[in-house]
Amino acid sequence: MILTVTLNPAIDVSYPLDELKCDTVNRVVDVTKTPGGKGLNVSRVLNDFGETVKATGCVGGESGDFIINHLPDSILSRFYKISGDTRTCIAILHEGNQTEILEKGPLLSVDEIDGFTHQFKYLLNDVDVVTMSGSLPAGMPDDYYQKLIKIANLNGKKTVLDCSGNALEAVLKGDSKPTVIKPNLEELSQLLGKEMTKDFEALKEVLQDELFEGIEWIIVSLGADGVFAKHKDTFYNVDIPKIKIVSAVGSGDSTVAGIASGLANDEDDRALLTKANVLGMLNAQEKTTGHVNMANYDKLYQSIKVKEV
């Protein structure tokens, strides 16, 4: 079983408009609302793929109830209730652009943070892999993921971390390391304080930096150019075919789902990397975020090329 952690989920609201007019009224006909947050995207893709998945995080108010009530029944919902209201994130789709308005989210108390930590320990009992995705809510310290990873490691669980900024930096500088991190080039550049490109030799060099010591897998997303990965002392380039992209939103989360599934099933390096990339591509072919059409899985799987470099 795989446990997904989404500490700062949201209701994602989509407003499609032919044209966004400023300083006047814009009327929307086709409004969609879905449970949002990177970890919930991971949950839905794992569910589509047929994995047993348990979802947790912090939710509150009517928005939190909406998230719990609108997840597929086959996803085990184990969310921790807080006093604040779960946030709403608005995406305005207009003229080929996407303008986002993101709420910060609720402020958690010390007691609520302690309560979630206790629940997290309990939820580890029957899982093999834990994914941790997205931003931390207000009130949680930057090193909170580090705390969860330490608990998971002590219980012999594999962990996949997908976050950025101070939260990721705190984990890299901490004592407890995740099994996998999945930065993109922009996040890697931010961490290292220098611009990183798709140059394989440069990537090889930086991924051996002491900052990443103790992390078994480092999987760097190159967007439409695939992935550059380091597993222990071996480096891989994953070459993916060109596809028609409907929406790339959530494709990174779908890749995380593939990584988690690969770890849970003890797959070899090539199988794990191939599965992860296929799920990311399948999500990009769908209008709905965090959804994959498994009818296209086998064909894409055969088109992925994993090369040791």
From Swiss-Prot:
Pathway: Carbohydrate metabolism; D-tagatose 6-phosphate degradation; D-glyceraldehyde 3-phosphate and glycerone phosphate from D-tagatose 6-phosphate: step 1/2. Keywords: ATP-binding, Kinase, Lactose metabolism, Nucleotide-binding, Transferase. Its EC number is 2.7.1.144. It catalyses: D-tagatofuranose 6-phosphate + ATP = D-tagatofuranose 1,6-bisphosphate + ADP + H(+). It comes from the Bacteria. It is an enzyme of class 2 (transferase). The keyword Kinase applies. GO terms for cellular component: cytosol. GO terms for molecular function: ATP binding; phosphofructokinase activity; tagatose-6-phosphate kinase activity. The keyword Transit peptide does not apply. Coiled coil: none annotated. Belongs to the carbohydrate kinase PfkB family. LacC subfamily. This is Tagatose-6-phosphate kinase. It comes from Streptococcus pyogenes serotype M12 (strain MGAS2096).
